[in-house]
A protein has these predicted regions:
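Flexible, gly/proline-biased loop segments at the beginnings
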Residues: 1-144
Length: 146
């Protein structure tokens, strides 16, 4: 039995240089009433762009948002008024769509904003809207830290 010596293979290594996104520096500017979200105040827009440019990133965000919503809000064992509100918390979409929009913002930005509209007498929430996180900025703290 004459065996040939085994040839050693060189490792096949490929280096991939991935684009790195520099995290924004949040700055208070005494001339403005809000905290800038990065140097050009555009970090939320950059996050949106990245989610659109990368199919994988967008799919991960969609999956996280859809997993958070699950089968939606159950209408079982609810009063007629509760079901009416769940079916239309505002004139444009139902509660499941509202939660999906919030879950998407939570996955992408780390937070979400709800905008409740009170009834004329102020006794109940008449409408509930999702507000686009990318359009909001934090206000500058006052002397009391609020």
């Amino acid at each position: 039995m004459n065996q040939e010596p085994k040839k050693t293979q060189e490792p096949n290594i490929i280096f991939v240089s991935l684009e790195q996104t520099e995290l924004p520096k949040f700055r208070e500017d005494g001339r403005k009433q809000w905290v800038s979200y990065g140097q050009d105040n555009d970090f939320p827009e950059r996050l949106l762009e990245l989610s659109r440019r990368s199919a994988l990133h967008g799919a991960i965000l969609s999956s996280k948002a859809n997993d958070a919503v699950g089968d939606g809000v159950s209408r079982k064992d609810r009063t007629a008024d509760e079901v009416a509100f769940l079916n239309a918390p505002n004139p444009e979409y139902d509660i499941d769509e509202l939660i999906l929009r919030c879950a998407w913002d939570l996955a992408l930005f780390g937070g979400f904003i709800l905008n409740p509209v009170m009834s004329n007498d102020g006794s109940r929430v008449a409408e509930l809207w999702h507000a686009d996180w990318s359009r909001f900025r934090s206000g500058v703290k006052d002397e009391d830290g609020r």
